[in-house]
Structures are given as structure tokens and as C-alpha cells.
Amino acid sequence: DMSMWLMEGKNPVSVYAKSVDGVLNQWGTKDSTFGIFTMDDGTIWSMNISWALPEVWPGSVYGLEIGIVGTEGVIDIEDTHRDLVLASNIAQGAGYTSREYSPPQGRHVDFLTSYPAGDIQGGQFWGPMREETNTWYTRLCTGQDTPHATAQDGHRNLLMTMAMDLSAKEEKEIVLPERMDDIF
């Protein structure tokens, strides 16, 4: 959503992506995907996401990086919150646990606040998802304008990520139609 907001008025014309699936393929997903989108004015932006990080990775769940490069500016987003680091001789809990998996060793370094939705503290939920939920609720109750993605934004972005997956699967650049709905 944010990448498209920052490039308002520009339309994606193609995507080229590569994926690897050496670890998580047994669960039907990719370890990591890297994609480069080209916009109608030549601007390019890259996005990579990796779910198969080492079990001792200090971030909670994944690594996400987004870069937008243009002649008028550059933005580089690294979304693992490496600015708040805890290092301890006492092992920290897993960054993410599920009912079926528990990592075999503790993590001694932790990127605090790196869980995407936020953190639980004192029985309360804090972080980006709390703020987004509260402002969304305010929008519903009061009609106040908020900076949330629209359903159309979400649909377009879903189709763009699907095109990214298709590019990785077919190992070729995917030229995007004017109407994203025409691709799927």
C-alpha cells in the first residue's frame, strides 16, 4: 500500500521476480521472493520478503525490505526494526511460535517491536496494528477521513503480488495489463 501511495499517479507496467523454496516448501510456500516492479514512467521499485530466516534471527517473523528509486528521490524501507536491539545472556523466547513448531534454541539477541502487528505488554496490545485498528474504528463510527488503504487498493496490490509470484514461477518478466483484473 505504502509503495503505491508514495508513487501516486504512476502505474505498474511489469514485474520480474525470483523465489527460493529450500526450507518451507514442505508447507507449500516459498522461503523468499525478490521482485522488481517497473512503473509507466520508468521508476523502479524492489520488494523482497523472506520467511525462512535462521531460527536465531533476532526479528520476530520475517525480513521485509522495499526500495523505490527515481530521478526525483529514493526511499529505502527496512522493516525489521533493527533500531531497538536487546542482547542478553538470558535466552529470549522465539520470535514466532505456532502450535506445531518450537525452535530448538533460544535467541540471545532480539529486535524489539519487530512483530508486525505489535506487542502485548501488561495484557494490552501496543503497536502499529493497534493504531490502525483504532483509527479504522474511528473512521467507521465518526466518518473521519483516515489514511487507510481502500478495498480497491488492496485488490490491486493483491493482484500485483500474484503477478510477482507468477513471474517467479514462470521465470520471466510479466508485462502487466492496463487493468490488473485482466491478468487473473
Residue ranges and their predicted role:
Residues H155-L158:
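C-terminal interaction segments
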Residues D1-G63, Q152, I183-F184:
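Rossmann-like dinucleotide-binding domain that binds NAD(P)(H)
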Residues F34, M39-D41, W57, G63-Q152, ...:
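C-terminal glycine/acidic-rich active-site capping loop/insertion
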Residues L6, R139, S167:
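Conserved catalytic core of Hanks-type protein kinase domains
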Residues M160-E170:
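Short arginine-rich
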Residues M2-L6, T135, M160:
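Amphipathic alpha-helical segments that form well-ordered structural scaffolds
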Residues V13-S14, E171-I174:
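Short, well-structured active-site flanking segments
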